[in-house]
């Protein structure tokens, strides 16, 4: 005699409680890998990686990009030990708009015997010259950008002042209308170099005026430097201060990365959608309601494990080991006809990832070297046979 199974595993993970809205839309990175992808390749593959020009070196362990949209591609499957290895397969791909980032400052850390890493000092330097240089190098011949270098710098400084008024002050009679306050950055840098630091990190800024979003306010994030010795990392950070970094200086085609960001918000939802609770059939006592869990608890009070309605989505989450299919400098190579829906045109550098990732379009995402990499370490990206440029309207 058939009957319903009354016992089942619980619905919904308890590992992501509390299911509340993220505090900030720009995620804070709580942990960094101890080795960069380049260090892992040399360690695991040895001469095979060295012959490809890969060597351990100081490198930023993270980058920032905006989610533009999705398409699909046909590639040659280069994964070993799969039944499609060496054959053409169709895969979904996600395109990220990845304009260069500006290194506004450095932050040195010392170790406190009781509290761990504590900030020792900061150095800030104007990125205006670097912004003009990267515009002339990457975006000046772009037919879709109608702004000049002067307008780009002015809009960036105006947006940066809204984020941190202490860094930029208005100067109506100057070339850009604003001035970046450096405040003796050379003396502060020498003080940092003379101190016995335990770690040094960069303070990076996005350049949204060069993306397809159309906003001016940049995001500021701290990024750790990995690889090499501490003195090599300090020298590398000194070279980056006040300059720009492109995505191909941080990542390599074919490697795996982690995606950190805030998921798409769903608002206030019930237990069926929020936890996947079994919806029982409506019977003659349906006046008591359907799509509910019935009794929440015994009389002593509600248990926290019981599914209840509430906020769904807009949570800070991390996705591990997403593979980079391609890194390019001309965004119109991957922009479909009519642009990405709800985003528009990718003007400059971009990243193509295998599969889907968290967040809606235009969401800021932090890309990090893998903190728990897989057992397979590919040296190259798979061969792309076809990429779909067809319009996504109505799909």
Swiss-Prot record:
<dbReference type="Pfam" id="PF00297">
    <property type="entry name" value="Ribosomal_L3"/>
</dbReference>
<comment type="function">
    <text>One of the primary rRNA binding proteins, it binds directly near the 3'-end of the 23S rRNA, where it nucleates assembly of the 50S subunit.</text>
</comment>
<feature type="region of interest" description="Disordered">
    <location>
        <begin position="286"/>
        <end position="313"/>
    </location>
</feature>
<dbReference type="GO" id="GO:0006412">
    <property type="term" value="P:translation"/>
</dbReference>
<dbReference type="InterPro" id="IPR045077">
    <property type="entry name" value="L3_arc_euk"/>
</dbReference>
<dbReference type="GO" id="GO:0019843">
    <property type="term" value="F:rRNA binding"/>
</dbReference>
<dbReference type="GO" id="GO:0022625">
    <property type="term" value="C:cytosolic large ribosomal subunit"/>
</dbReference>
<keyword id="KW-0694">RNA-binding</keyword>
<protein>
    <recommendedName>
        <fullName>Large ribosomal subunit protein uL3</fullName>
    </recommendedName>
</protein>
<dbReference type="InterPro" id="IPR009000">
    <property type="entry name" value="Transl_B-barrel_sf"/>
</dbReference>
<dbReference type="InterPro" id="IPR000597">
    <property type="entry name" value="Ribosomal_uL3"/>
</dbReference>
<keyword id="KW-0699">rRNA-binding</keyword>
<keyword id="KW-0687">Ribonucleoprotein</keyword>
<keyword id="KW-0689">Ribosomal protein</keyword>
<dbReference type="InterPro" id="IPR019926">
    <property type="entry name" value="Ribosomal_uL3_CS"/>
</dbReference>
<comment type="subunit">
    <text>Part of the 50S ribosomal subunit. Forms a cluster with proteins L14 and L24e.</text>
</comment>
<dbReference type="GO" id="GO:0003735">
    <property type="term" value="F:structural constituent of ribosome"/>
</dbReference>
<dbReference type="InterPro" id="IPR044892">
    <property type="entry name" value="Ribosomal_L3_dom_3_arc_sf"/>
</dbReference>
<dbReference type="InterPro" id="IPR019928">
    <property type="entry name" value="Ribosomal_uL3_arc"/>
</dbReference>
<comment type="similarity">
    <text>Belongs to the universal ribosomal protein uL3 family.</text>
</comment>
